[in-house]
A protein has these predicted regions:
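Cell wall/extracellular polymer interaction/catalysis modules
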Residues: 1-99, 113-133, 138-141
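A conserved hydrophobic position in a structured secondary element of the catalytic/binding core
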Residues: 108-109
Length: 141
């Protein structure tokens, strides 16, 4: 199988304020539930614009926050294919918030970290080590 590599990246699952106030879905903004999601992503394009991990391989469980108060409520769960991608926050600088970057996706804060992460995914694909990606989300309390 090869050597395992473990890396940790500063990221967020917090949707942007704009999506909290005006969600894309009638039942509320998506917030990824903590847990392990195996094989749910493949390399693709986020909104057709740049390389990202896109949800194609399995369902993800989310919370739906529908009260429009910009505070995450971890109550109403839904599981399925929601287009939860892993993408960057800013293109060229560290971001202190998600601005309008996220409707519930996972965003890596540092563009340099993101570039490294995507390159590791590309290398895995190129070396025949697999084209599906898993992740484990631990929520800070």
């Amino acid at each position: 199988l090869g050597d395992w590599l473990e890396e940790v990246y500063e990221c967020t699952t917090d949707p942007s304020t704009s999506y909290h106030r005006v969600p894309l879905h009638a039942t509320g903004v998506a917030i990824v539930k903590e847990g392990q999601y195996r094989g749910v992503w493949k390399l693709g394009k986020h909104r057709g614009l740049y390389k990202a991990l896109v949800q194609t391989g399995g369902p993800i469980t989310i919370y739906r926050d529908s009260n429009l108060d910009d505070i995450a409520d971890y109550v109403d769960e839904d599981t399925g294919y929601f287009g939860i991608n892993l993408h960057r926050a800013g293109r060229s600088s560290l971001m202190d918030n998600t601005k309008d970057f996220s409707a519930g996706c996972i965003c890596i804060r540092s563009p340099l970290d993101y570039a490294r992460f995507i390159r590791l995914c590309e290398l895995q694909d190129e070396n025949g080590k697999g084209s599906k990606y898993s992740f484990t989300l631990v929520r800070e309390k």
